[in-house]
Amino acid sequence: MEKLRVELGERSYEILIDRGNLSLIGERLLRFSISKKIGIISNPKVSELYGQKVISSLQKEGFEPFVILIPDGEHYKDYFWAYHILTQLLEFGFDRGSFLIALGGGVIGDITGFVASIYMRGISYIQIPTTLLAQVDSSVGGKTAVNHPLGKNMIGTFWQPSLVWIDVDTLESLPEREFISGLAEVIKYGVIWDKEFFEFLEINRTKILKKDKDILISIIKRACEIKAEVVSKDERESALRAILNYGHTIGHAIETLTGYSSYLHGEAISIGMVHEAKLSSMLGFLDKEDFEKIRNILKEFGLPVNLPINMDSSAMLKTILLDKKNIEGKIRMVIPDSIGKMKINFEISGEDLKKVLNE
């Protein structure tokens, strides 16, 4: 088992990475001072695959698990379904000592964390991410949110989990498209932080795409190490943590304007990374060779790199102006200076951004 730690003082927690460890979660939770009542938040597909294994493990140790299901999909990560979960918790009699488990991908993790942060002014929860994207990104760091029709993740909190429990065997059931989508976030870590990791991904592309378990554990661990280091230094995104938003300014706009139905999150982020790198190159920072490397690795892993054909640049710009990184109406983005080095919260003119979007 690989063990990492996110250092945040009293809110520090472990990330545990292994194979076939879902059946051990009940034993692990005995270490926490919690009541016996545990809510498992999941979707029907994931619950059918892994729910009973988690339930049996919890019951074996004397816990009382309750399952709350929400539909699968980004467009269900909204206040209506958060309210539904809150209602269920109240009806089941959950109190401040109760505990939540997010069993699923990024949508489940985000909405579970959000509910945990506001239910009775905050209860504990753990992340059991079952998608690659959630394992390397959204399960770590304590960002929680639900979407709003005007923008993604606009309503949210910072609420750290008590534990992140990763079983790479869950990736066996992950649809290929979702697996590839998760690789966008993995590649992002190489671009923003670690050139050697970027090169490792280039070299081991075939093994990664074949889902070699040892390689998967290796890349998940390195991605989590990078995110844990960043979050430990800047929990609430006052400066450094913004680096993790590379690709997300344009990516989130794509998701919003397509109604979260045309692109998976990683696919939109891939397009965002390419065009934010192109913007950096146009401004004279990122050299052409590094831009081509970023574009090529994403393309070679099977990720999209081009904007939707009918995407209106004016609508994109209007959506980007609502981005959380902006201050006083000024667009601030994270753009690569070189592979492994970034410019954080760099101010971009609307004119330059539209130029890149229209190319």
Curated annotation (Swiss-Prot):
<comment type="similarity">
    <text>Belongs to the sugar phosphate cyclases superfamily. Dehydroquinate synthase family.</text>
</comment>
<dbReference type="InterPro" id="IPR050071">
    <property type="entry name" value="Dehydroquinate_synthase"/>
</dbReference>
<feature type="binding site">
    <location>
        <begin position="72"/>
        <end position="77"/>
    </location>
    <ligand>
        <name>NAD(+)</name>
    </ligand>
</feature>
<keyword id="KW-0479">Metal-binding</keyword>
<feature type="binding site">
    <location>
        <position position="248"/>
    </location>
    <ligand>
        <name>Zn(2+)</name>
    </ligand>
</feature>
<keyword id="KW-0520">NAD</keyword>
<dbReference type="InterPro" id="IPR030960">
    <property type="entry name" value="DHQS/DOIS_N"/>
</dbReference>
<keyword id="KW-0963">Cytoplasm</keyword>
<comment type="pathway">
    <text>Metabolic intermediate biosynthesis; chorismate biosynthesis; chorismate from D-erythrose 4-phosphate and phosphoenolpyruvate: step 2/7.</text>
</comment>
<feature type="binding site">
    <location>
        <position position="185"/>
    </location>
    <ligand>
        <name>Zn(2+)</name>
    </ligand>
</feature>
<feature type="binding site">
    <location>
        <begin position="130"/>
        <end position="131"/>
    </location>
    <ligand>
        <name>NAD(+)</name>
    </ligand>
</feature>
<dbReference type="Pfam" id="PF01761">
    <property type="entry name" value="DHQ_synthase"/>
</dbReference>
<keyword id="KW-0028">Amino-acid biosynthesis</keyword>
<comment type="function">
    <text>Catalyzes the conversion of 3-deoxy-D-arabino-heptulosonate 7-phosphate (DAHP) to dehydroquinate (DHQ).</text>
</comment>
<dbReference type="InterPro" id="IPR016037">
    <property type="entry name" value="DHQ_synth_AroB"/>
</dbReference>
<keyword id="KW-0547">Nucleotide-binding</keyword>
<keyword id="KW-0862">Zinc</keyword>
<feature type="binding site">
    <location>
        <position position="265"/>
    </location>
    <ligand>
        <name>Zn(2+)</name>
    </ligand>
</feature>
<dbReference type="GO" id="GO:0003856">
    <property type="term" value="F:3-dehydroquinate synthase activity"/>
</dbReference>
<dbReference type="InterPro" id="IPR056179">
    <property type="entry name" value="DHQS_C"/>
</dbReference>
<feature type="binding site">
    <location>
        <position position="152"/>
    </location>
    <ligand>
        <name>NAD(+)</name>
    </ligand>
</feature>
<keyword id="KW-0456">Lyase</keyword>
<protein>
    <recommendedName>
        <fullName>3-dehydroquinate synthase</fullName>
        <ecNumber>4.2.3.4</ecNumber>
    </recommendedName>
</protein>
<dbReference type="GO" id="GO:0008652">
    <property type="term" value="P:amino acid biosynthetic process"/>
</dbReference>
<dbReference type="GO" id="GO:0046872">
    <property type="term" value="F:metal ion binding"/>
</dbReference>
<keyword id="KW-0057">Aromatic amino acid biosynthesis</keyword>
<dbReference type="GO" id="GO:0009423">
    <property type="term" value="P:chorismate biosynthetic process"/>
</dbReference>
<dbReference type="InterPro" id="IPR030963">
    <property type="entry name" value="DHQ_synth_fam"/>
</dbReference>
<feature type="binding site">
    <location>
        <position position="143"/>
    </location>
    <ligand>
        <name>NAD(+)</name>
    </ligand>
</feature>
<feature type="binding site">
    <location>
        <begin position="106"/>
        <end position="110"/>
    </location>
    <ligand>
        <name>NAD(+)</name>
    </ligand>
</feature>
<dbReference type="GO" id="GO:0000166">
    <property type="term" value="F:nucleotide binding"/>
</dbReference>
<keyword id="KW-0170">Cobalt</keyword>
<dbReference type="GO" id="GO:0009073">
    <property type="term" value="P:aromatic amino acid family biosynthetic process"/>
</dbReference>
<dbReference type="Pfam" id="PF24621">
    <property type="entry name" value="DHQS_C"/>
</dbReference>
<dbReference type="GO" id="GO:0005737">
    <property type="term" value="C:cytoplasm"/>
</dbReference>
